[in-house]
Amino acid sequence: MEQKIILITGASSGIGRDAALALAAHGHKVYAAARRTDLMEPLRAHGIEVLHMDVTDGQSMADGVEAILKAEGRIDVLVNNAGYGYFGAVETVSMEEARRQLEVNVFGLARLCQLVLPAMRQQRSGRIVNISSVAGRSVFYFGGWYHVSKYSVEALSDALRMEAKPFGIDVAMIEPGAIKTDWGIIAADHLRDSAAGTAYETDATRWAATLRSMYQSNHLSSPSTVTRAILRAVESRRPRARYRTGRLSGTIVFFHWLLPARWWDALMRLGARV
Protein backbone atom coordinates (compact mmCIF):
# COMPACT_ATOMS: atom_id res chain seq x y z
CA MET A 1 0.00 0.00 0.00
CA GLU A 2 1.43 3.37 -1.05
CA GLN A 3 1.96 5.74 1.86
CA LYS A 4 -0.59 8.54 1.99
CA ILE A 5 -0.32 11.94 3.65
CA ILE A 6 -3.40 12.16 5.86
CA LEU A 7 -4.92 14.99 7.90
CA ILE A 8 -7.46 13.89 10.51
CA THR A 9 -9.34 16.30 12.77
CA GLY A 10 -10.79 15.68 16.22
CA ALA A 11 -7.87 13.38 16.96
CA SER A 12 -7.41 14.06 20.67
CA SER A 13 -9.84 11.33 21.77
CA GLY A 14 -12.36 8.69 20.74
CA ILE A 15 -12.75 7.77 17.09
CA GLY A 16 -10.23 10.35 15.86
CA ARG A 17 -7.46 9.15 18.14
CA ASP A 18 -8.12 5.49 17.37
CA ALA A 19 -8.19 6.15 13.62
CA ALA A 20 -4.97 8.19 13.71
CA LEU A 21 -3.14 5.32 15.41
CA ALA A 22 -4.53 2.74 12.99
CA LEU A 23 -3.69 4.80 9.90
CA ALA A 24 -0.13 5.29 11.16
CA ALA A 25 0.15 1.56 11.87
CA HIS A 26 -0.81 0.95 8.23
CA GLY A 27 2.23 2.94 7.15
CA HIS A 28 0.62 6.29 6.38
CA LYS A 29 2.01 9.69 7.38
CA VAL A 30 -0.64 11.06 9.72
CA TYR A 31 -1.18 14.63 10.86
CA ALA A 32 -3.49 14.53 13.89
CA ALA A 33 -5.30 17.81 14.54
CA ALA A 34 -7.33 19.09 17.48
CA ARG A 35 -7.53 22.02 19.88
CA ARG A 36 -6.02 20.08 22.82
CA THR A 37 -2.54 19.25 21.56
CA ASP A 38 -1.51 18.19 25.07
CA LEU A 39 -3.87 15.20 24.81
CA MET A 40 -2.22 14.15 21.54
CA GLU A 41 1.41 14.19 22.71
CA PRO A 42 1.48 10.37 23.20
CA LEU A 43 0.68 9.99 19.48
CA ARG A 44 4.15 11.29 18.59
CA ALA A 45 5.66 8.02 19.80
CA HIS A 46 3.81 6.34 16.91
CA GLY A 47 5.30 8.64 14.28
CA ILE A 48 2.21 10.85 14.15
CA GLU A 49 2.60 14.60 13.68
CA VAL A 50 0.49 16.73 16.02
CA LEU A 51 -1.20 19.95 14.88
CA HIS A 52 -3.17 22.54 16.81
CA MET A 53 -6.37 23.20 14.89
CA ASP A 54 -9.66 24.81 15.88
CA VAL A 55 -12.32 24.07 13.27
CA THR A 56 -14.22 27.22 14.27
CA ASP A 57 -11.18 29.37 13.43
CA GLY A 58 -10.52 29.88 9.72
CA GLN A 59 -6.94 31.04 10.24
CA SER A 60 -6.13 28.04 12.43
CA MET A 61 -7.36 25.68 9.70
CA ALA A 62 -5.52 27.56 6.94
CA ASP A 63 -2.27 27.53 8.94
CA GLY A 64 -2.57 23.79 9.55
CA VAL A 65 -3.14 22.91 5.90
CA GLU A 66 -0.33 25.24 4.83
CA ALA A 67 2.08 23.61 7.31
CA ILE A 68 1.36 20.14 5.89
CA LEU A 69 1.73 21.28 2.29
CA LYS A 70 5.01 23.01 3.14
CA ALA A 71 6.38 19.88 4.84
CA GLU A 72 5.03 17.22 2.47
CA GLY A 73 4.15 18.95 -0.77
CA ARG A 74 0.75 17.29 -0.87
CA ILE A 75 -2.27 16.11 1.11
CA ASP A 76 -3.72 12.81 -0.08
CA VAL A 77 -6.54 12.34 2.42
CA LEU A 78 -8.62 14.59 4.65
CA VAL A 79 -10.63 12.85 7.38
CA ASN A 80 -13.16 15.34 8.78
CA ASN A 81 -13.85 13.80 12.18
CA ALA A 82 -14.18 16.80 14.53
CA GLY A 83 -17.69 17.20 15.89
CA TYR A 84 -19.97 17.00 18.91
CA GLY A 85 -23.67 16.69 19.73
CA TYR A 86 -25.72 19.43 21.38
CA PHE A 87 -29.12 18.01 22.33
CA GLY A 88 -32.07 20.10 23.43
CA ALA A 89 -35.52 21.22 22.34
CA VAL A 90 -35.51 23.49 19.29
CA GLU A 91 -37.22 26.17 21.40
CA THR A 92 -34.76 26.10 24.28
CA VAL A 93 -31.37 25.75 22.58
CA SER A 94 -29.98 29.26 22.24
CA MET A 95 -29.13 30.57 18.78
CA GLU A 96 -25.54 30.92 20.00
CA GLU A 97 -25.36 27.20 20.80
CA ALA A 98 -27.15 26.29 17.56
CA ARG A 99 -24.65 28.32 15.54
CA ARG A 100 -21.73 26.73 17.36
CA GLN A 101 -23.13 23.27 16.59
CA LEU A 102 -23.18 24.15 12.90
CA GLU A 103 -19.81 25.93 13.02
CA VAL A 104 -18.08 22.80 14.32
CA ASN A 105 -20.00 20.05 12.54
CA VAL A 106 -20.72 21.73 9.19
CA PHE A 107 -18.87 24.96 8.44
CA GLY A 108 -15.53 23.79 9.84
CA LEU A 109 -15.82 20.61 7.79
CA ALA A 110 -16.75 22.58 4.67
CA ARG A 111 -13.92 25.09 5.11
CA LEU A 112 -11.32 22.34 5.45
CA CYS A 113 -12.63 20.80 2.22
CA GLN A 114 -12.21 24.18 0.54
CA LEU A 115 -8.65 24.47 1.84
CA VAL A 116 -7.42 21.04 0.66
CA LEU A 117 -9.25 20.88 -2.67
CA PRO A 118 -6.89 23.18 -4.65
CA ALA A 119 -3.87 20.99 -3.77
CA MET A 120 -5.77 17.77 -4.47
CA ARG A 121 -7.01 19.15 -7.78
CA GLN A 122 -3.45 20.05 -8.76
CA GLN A 123 -2.36 16.50 -7.84
CA ARG A 124 -5.28 15.10 -9.85
CA SER A 125 -5.93 12.82 -6.90
CA GLY A 126 -7.18 12.94 -3.35
CA ARG A 127 -9.77 11.64 -0.96
CA ILE A 128 -12.08 13.31 1.53
CA VAL A 129 -13.69 11.16 4.23
CA ASN A 130 -16.42 12.92 6.18
CA ILE A 131 -17.58 11.40 9.45
CA SER A 132 -21.34 11.73 9.32
CA SER A 133 -23.73 9.58 11.37
CA VAL A 134 -26.97 7.67 11.22
CA ALA A 135 -28.15 10.97 12.76
CA GLY A 136 -27.98 12.25 9.19
CA ARG A 137 -30.50 9.60 8.14
CA SER A 138 -32.92 9.67 11.12
CA VAL A 139 -34.10 12.03 13.88
CA PHE A 140 -34.12 11.35 17.62
CA TYR A 141 -36.09 13.10 20.34
CA PHE A 142 -34.52 16.44 21.31
CA GLY A 143 -31.73 16.03 18.75
CA GLY A 144 -32.91 18.79 16.42
CA TRP A 145 -29.81 20.93 15.95
CA TYR A 146 -27.44 17.96 15.96
CA HIS A 147 -29.52 16.29 13.26
CA VAL A 148 -29.57 19.52 11.25
CA SER A 149 -25.77 19.41 11.29
CA LYS A 150 -25.51 15.77 10.23
CA TYR A 151 -28.18 16.01 7.52
CA SER A 152 -26.12 18.95 6.23
CA VAL A 153 -22.95 16.83 6.19
CA GLU A 154 -24.80 14.23 4.13
CA ALA A 155 -25.98 16.80 1.58
CA LEU A 156 -22.62 18.58 1.38
CA SER A 157 -20.79 15.29 0.91
CA ASP A 158 -23.15 14.16 -1.84
CA ALA A 159 -22.72 17.49 -3.65
CA LEU A 160 -18.95 17.50 -3.22
CA ARG A 161 -18.62 13.91 -4.44
CA MET A 162 -20.16 14.89 -7.79
CA GLU A 163 -18.15 18.12 -8.08
CA ALA A 164 -14.76 16.63 -7.18
CA LYS A 165 -14.91 13.40 -9.19
CA PRO A 166 -13.79 14.95 -12.53
CA PHE A 167 -10.54 15.97 -10.82
CA GLY A 168 -9.73 12.48 -9.53
CA ILE A 169 -10.92 13.27 -6.01
CA ASP A 170 -13.15 10.80 -4.15
CA VAL A 171 -15.54 11.69 -1.33
CA ALA A 172 -16.85 9.11 1.13
CA MET A 173 -18.96 9.27 4.26
CA ILE A 174 -18.81 7.16 7.40
CA GLU A 175 -22.19 6.73 9.14
CA PRO A 176 -21.59 5.34 12.64
CA GLY A 177 -24.38 4.07 14.83
CA ALA A 178 -24.07 3.88 18.62
CA ILE A 179 -20.35 4.02 19.47
CA LYS A 180 -18.94 3.89 23.00
CA THR A 181 -17.29 7.30 23.37
CA ASP A 182 -17.93 10.34 25.57
CA TRP A 183 -20.25 11.72 22.86
CA GLY A 184 -23.46 10.40 24.44
CA ILE A 185 -22.59 11.58 27.95
CA ILE A 186 -21.82 15.08 26.66
CA ALA A 187 -25.05 15.16 24.62
CA ALA A 188 -27.05 14.01 27.66
CA ASP A 189 -25.53 16.74 29.83
CA HIS A 190 -26.31 19.39 27.20
CA LEU A 191 -29.89 18.14 26.99
CA ARG A 192 -30.40 18.23 30.75
CA ASP A 193 -28.90 21.71 31.09
CA SER A 194 -30.76 23.24 28.14
CA ALA A 195 -34.13 21.96 29.43
CA ALA A 196 -33.76 23.00 33.07
CA GLY A 197 -36.73 25.09 34.17
CA THR A 198 -38.52 24.81 30.81
CA ALA A 199 -41.74 23.14 29.67
CA TYR A 200 -39.63 20.29 28.29
CA GLU A 201 -37.74 19.51 31.50
CA THR A 202 -39.55 16.30 32.48
CA ASP A 203 -39.23 14.50 29.14
CA ALA A 204 -35.77 15.91 28.46
CA THR A 205 -34.44 14.80 31.84
CA ARG A 206 -35.75 11.28 31.27
CA TRP A 207 -34.36 11.13 27.74
CA ALA A 208 -31.00 12.42 29.02
CA ALA A 209 -30.98 9.59 31.57
CA THR A 210 -31.75 7.09 28.79
CA LEU A 211 -28.87 8.46 26.69
CA ARG A 212 -26.46 8.39 29.62
CA SER A 213 -27.42 4.82 30.53
CA MET A 214 -26.99 3.69 26.93
CA TYR A 215 -23.53 5.22 26.56
CA GLN A 216 -22.36 3.90 29.92
CA SER A 217 -23.37 0.35 29.01
CA ASN A 218 -21.16 -2.30 27.42
CA HIS A 219 -23.57 -2.94 24.56
CA LEU A 220 -22.21 -0.33 22.16
CA SER A 221 -19.61 -0.75 19.44
CA SER A 222 -16.05 0.38 20.13
CA PRO A 223 -14.35 3.23 18.21
CA SER A 224 -12.27 0.58 16.41
CA THR A 225 -15.44 -0.42 14.54
CA VAL A 226 -15.54 3.02 12.95
CA THR A 227 -11.78 2.99 12.42
CA ARG A 228 -12.09 -0.13 10.27
CA ALA A 229 -14.60 1.67 8.06
CA ILE A 230 -12.28 4.69 7.83
CA LEU A 231 -9.41 2.43 6.77
CA ARG A 232 -11.56 0.94 4.02
CA ALA A 233 -12.61 4.39 2.83
CA VAL A 234 -8.99 5.59 2.80
CA GLU A 235 -7.35 2.55 1.22
CA SER A 236 -9.96 1.20 -1.19
CA ARG A 237 -9.27 1.72 -4.89
CA ARG A 238 -12.89 2.70 -5.42
CA PRO A 239 -14.39 3.86 -2.12
CA ARG A 240 -18.12 3.63 -1.54
CA ALA A 241 -20.17 6.78 -1.07
CA ARG A 242 -21.28 5.59 2.38
CA TYR A 243 -19.95 3.19 4.99
CA ARG A 244 -22.56 2.46 7.65
CA THR A 245 -20.98 0.92 10.71
CA GLY A 246 -21.52 0.22 14.39
CA ARG A 247 -24.24 -1.22 16.54
CA LEU A 248 -27.82 -0.55 15.42
CA SER A 249 -26.71 1.65 12.50
CA GLY A 250 -28.55 -0.36 9.87
CA THR A 251 -31.51 -1.03 12.15
CA ILE A 252 -32.03 2.65 12.96
CA VAL A 253 -31.95 3.76 9.32
CA PHE A 254 -34.19 0.89 8.22
CA PHE A 255 -36.91 1.54 10.80
CA HIS A 256 -36.79 5.30 10.27
CA TRP A 257 -37.46 4.59 6.59
CA LEU A 258 -40.05 1.88 7.24
CA LEU A 259 -42.22 3.30 10.02
CA PRO A 260 -44.87 5.97 9.46
CA ALA A 261 -43.75 9.28 10.96
CA ARG A 262 -46.29 9.14 13.79
CA TRP A 263 -45.03 5.65 14.79
CA TRP A 264 -41.42 6.80 14.82
CA ASP A 265 -42.37 9.88 16.85
CA ALA A 266 -44.20 7.71 19.39
CA LEU A 267 -41.20 5.37 19.64
CA MET A 268 -38.90 8.31 20.38
CA ARG A 269 -41.23 9.72 23.04
CA LEU A 270 -41.43 6.28 24.60
CA GLY A 271 -37.71 6.56 25.31
CA ALA A 272 -38.48 9.47 27.62
CA ARG A 273 -40.90 7.32 29.60
CA VAL A 274 -38.46 4.53 30.39
Task: Please give the residue ranges for each predicted region.
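Conserved glycine-rich cofactor-binding loop
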Residues: 12-13
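The beta1-alpha1 cofactor-binding region of Rossmann-like NAD(H)/NADP(H)-dependent oxidoreductases
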Residues: 53-63, 95
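A glycine-rich helix->loop->beta "capping" turn
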Residues: 67-78, 86
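Substrate-binding pocket helix/loop in short-chain dehydrogenase/reductase
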Residues: 89-90, 97-99
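Active-site helix of classical SDR
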Residues: 113, 149-152
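C-terminal beta-strand-loop-alpha-helix "lid" module of Rossmann-like NAD(P)-dependent dehydrogenases
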Residues: 166-215
